[in-house]
Swiss-Prot record:
The keyword Transcription does not apply. Belongs to the cueball family. Glycans are attached at N83, N109, N190, N285, N339, N449, N458, N493. Keywords: Cell membrane, Differentiation, Disulfide bond, EGF-like domain, Glycoprotein, Membrane, Oogenesis, Repeat, Signal, Spermatogenesis, Transmembrane, Transmembrane helix. Its main location: membrane. This is Protein cueball.
Length: 636
């Protein structure tokens, strides 16, 4: 009986190892770094923006996102769901599936634009743009309970959009995108102390996020026209700075990590990133160009919400404002684990031991979410990676109070990771670079015949002109630094002098030829310009004083009633004559080209031209003949 029990226990332990250690290593929820909402699903991606999973396929119109990093819960909104408005999603690593539960019941025609979560009081906050209100509700209560109103903007016509919770200082920030009265405001989580912190030079603010590492807020403003702006300020609205201004995008929501800002773009259906300004880091002496936004991923469907894993509980354990909040949240999680009152078998105890061994370096294991909370200075699914591992290239690494690696560089190197050599490219022409140990200043030990702070001057090439001039005029002045070089050139029997004569000619020859060439170019350009100006003036005068073509007017008589055919009328060609008559003036009939639109009888004109040519030809008689014949033809 004991042998059978031992075998069963061994099999159970093996089963536990395979089903706990492997899933935690391979299918842990820590595997994803970002989550974004498309129209009908939530995508989970890693830090290289490769899709590693998706969820919530049963929904049709997803929008806002919020993330509870303490319990690995995603909160999202569905605009089209009939019963629920906000839902929670938990990724189950053991069975590679997802559990979705309703968190807030739909109260009417809801339109959630922004969503935020407070892990201390376990409250959800969201902005309803259609009802112009900001609501909140506890996830510990039943989802059927109606939410409460924190801020009511309906009386002033406000349009709340993005919301963000400062969990350390217990404040709620939101953007109001009301046209011509847009603002960024904040209020205490208890509903007191509302104030407007940004109200100037702002058009349509959308997403907003709190950065606890720099104690600043970041928001995105969809400007009028084709531009948008990414701006930042301190938590009280002071020290406002423009981070980025770009165009041809429709930004919606924001997320932020240690060193990067992310936002969703509805126009390109994509996610973009931009480096976060280093507010709390010392500036390096390396010249860097202005970075450009980077498109990380794009999809066929519209993209709306985005959340990022920040490592909040690892990096803010020693922060002055956040330490107490982090401690209370961890204490609440530990109390949940200690409240298990059911009896535990030997297999369950062994399972707990394996779970504790799974998280390394003193990390805490969270059985509800199957993940590890790492201590300061470690990361990874099992907290197995030191933050200082291979971080500093030429220096010593230490973990700062914020939980980030910091490098102390060797005296010849600089940079955030000590990756830049101070002397790299400083000394020219094979000069040797020296670094002062006390001041850190750079100096160069130059080769022979090279001078300058960076060995940039070639004394041989510089003195060649003087030496050439000295050869022709022995009494000429030569700088003291060129005396030895000229003696060497003289001893070489003119070989080096001839070589440097082509490379560095005397100052009297080079500039004169250059000046003569410049004078010729200026003269040619001036003559051509003058001729062109004269041609333009002559052409203008011709257009002004050119005689106008004569305008010809003729008057014809038209009778109202036709008479009977007379003997002089020919069949099919007689024209009626009128007893009552009126005058019709035809103007400028024959001013057209006679070759294209003749208004004469060609045979008759030909006879007239033949008779005229036998006499003296006259151009002015042509129009008279044309009009005369046309008048006779019409009257007959």
């Amino acid at each position: 009986m004991k042998l059978c029990t031992s075998q069963q226990f061994g099999v159970a332990v093996l089963f536990i190892v395979l089903n706990i250690c492997s899933p935690l290593a391979d299918a842990s929820p820590i595997a994803w770094d970002f989550a974004v909402t498309l129209r009908d699903k939530i995508l989970f991606v890693d830090n290289r923006w490769r899709t590693i999973g998706s969820a919530a396929h049963e929904f049709e119109e997803l929008s806002a996102l919020a993330f509870d990093e303490a319990e690995e819960l995603i909160y999202f909104n569905d605009q089209q769901h009939q019963n629920g408005s906000i839902f929670s999603l938990r990724r189950d690593a053991t069975v590679a599936s997802h559990i979705v539960e309703q968190a807030v019941q739909r109260t009417g025609n809801d339109s959630v634009s922004g969503l935020a979560y407070d892990p201390l009081n376990r409250n959800l906050f969201w902005a309803d743009m259609r009802q112009s209100k900001i609501y909140f509700a506890s996830i510990d209560t039943l989802y059927t309970e109606p939410p409460k109103v924190l801020v009511d903007l309906s009386a002033e016509g406000g349009r709340p959009d993005g919301v963000a919770v400062d969990i350390c200082r217990r404040q709620l920030y939101w953007t109001n995108c009301k046209i011509n009265h847009a603002t960024v405001e904040r209020i205490g989580l208890n509903g007191t102390g509302r104030e407007t912190i940004i109200k100037q030079d702002i058009d349509m603010p959308r997403g907003i996020v709190i950065d606890q590492l720099s104690d600043r807020i970041f928001w995105i403003d969809d400007k009028v026209g084709i531009f948008f702006a990414l701006e930042s300020a301190r938590l009280d609205g002071s020290d406002r700075q423009l981070v980025l201004k770009d165009k041809h995008q429709s930004p919606i929501q924001l997320a932020i990590t240690e060193d990067t800002i992310y936002w969703t773009d509805k126009a390109d259906k994509a996610v973009w990133s931009y480096p976060k300004p280093a507010y709390n880091k010392p500036a390096t002496n390396s010249s860097e160009t202005q970075p450009q936004p980077t498109k990380l991923a794009s999809w066929k469907d519209d993209v709306y919400g985005i959340v990022a894993r920040t490592g909040f509980y690892q990096h803010l354990q020693k922060d002055a404002h956040c330490a107490s909040v982090v401690r209370k949240v961890k204490q609440r999680l530990d109390n949940k684990l200690n409240n298990r009152t059911h009896e535990r078998s030997a297999v369950e105890e062994r399972m707990d031991a394996l779970e504790r061994e799974h998280c390394l370096n003193g990390a805490s294991y969270m059985s509800r979410g199957n993940f590890c909370i790492c201590p300061v200075g470690y990361k990874g699914a099992r907290c197995e990676i030191s933050e200082c591992h291979n971080f500093c290239v030429h220096g010593t690494c230490e973990i700062s109070d914020m939980g980030y690696p910091k490098c102390y560089c060797q005296e010849d190197f600089y940079g955030e990771r000590c990756e830049y050599y101070k002397c790299n490219g400083h000394c020219l022409n094979d000069g040797h670079c020296l670094v002062d140990k006390e001041s850190g200043e750079l100096s160069c030990d130059c080769r022979e015949n090279f001078t300058g702070t960076r060995c940039e001057h070639n004394e041989t090439a510089h003195c060649a002109s003087y030496c050439q001039h000295l050869k022709q005029h022995p009494d000429a002045f030569v700088p003291a630094s060129c005396v030895d070089i000229c003696e060497e050139l003289h001893l070489s029997n003119g070989t080096i002098v001839t070589e440097y004569q082509a490379a560095a000619p005397l100052c009297a020859d080079g500039p004169s030829s250059l000046r003569s060439g410049s004078v010729i170019i200026v003269l040619v350009v001036g003559i051509v310009s003058s001729l062109a100006l004269v041609a333009v003036i002559v052409h203008g005068l011709r257009l002004i004083y050119k005689p106008k073509r004569p305008r010809i007017k003729k008057t014809f008589v038209v009778r109202k009633q036709a008479r009977l055919n007379s003997a002089s009328d020919t069949p099919l060609t007689n024209r009626p004559l009128a007893t009552e008559q009126c005058e019709i003036t035809i103007e400028n009939c024959c001013n057209m080209n006679i070759c294209e639109t003749p208004c004469f009888d060609p045979k008759l004109v030909e006879q007239q031209f033949a008779a005229r040519d036998r006499k003296s030809p006259c151009v002015k008689e042509d129009k008279k003949i044309l009009i005369h014949n046309m008048e006779d033809d019409l009257l007959t």
